[in-house]
């Protein structure tokens, strides 16, 4: 079973700039560990986990990559692919939108 990265400095990542060099090294190391697993083992990594996403700009490739990765790891994903279809567009704060999404 894959071990959680205990020293990871962030819970929420908004930008690559949010990550330290140590964080990136942990991610690369964990990626290598996952790549050595067979498909059945990989599907257990995110079983029971859900990824929520909110894109403020259209980003088909990135969104599909996130969705595909979660599916391959056994998890699910949901989100808003374009902020113009969210309540942020109607004046709801980003914090409120994130709070609502985190409940799922």
Functional labels for PLM-detected ranges:
Residues 1-64, 68:
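Positively charged, low-complexity intrinsically disordered leader regions
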Residues 50-104:
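Active-site cofactor/substrate anionic-group-binding motifs, chiefly glycine-
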């Amino acid at each position: 079973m894959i071990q959680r990265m205990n020293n990871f400095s962030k819970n929420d990542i908004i930008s690559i700039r949010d990550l330290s060099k140590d964080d990136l090294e942990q991610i690369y190391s964990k990626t290598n560990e996952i790549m050595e697993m067979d498909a059945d083992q990989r599907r257990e990594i995110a079983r029971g986990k859900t990824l929520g996403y909110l894109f403020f700009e259209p980003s088909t490739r990135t969104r599909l990559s996130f969705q595909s990765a979660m599916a391959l790891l056994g998890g699910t994903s949901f989100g808003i692919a374009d902020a113009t279809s969210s309540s942020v567009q109607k004046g709801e704060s980003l914090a409120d939108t994130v709070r609502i999404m985190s409940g799922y």
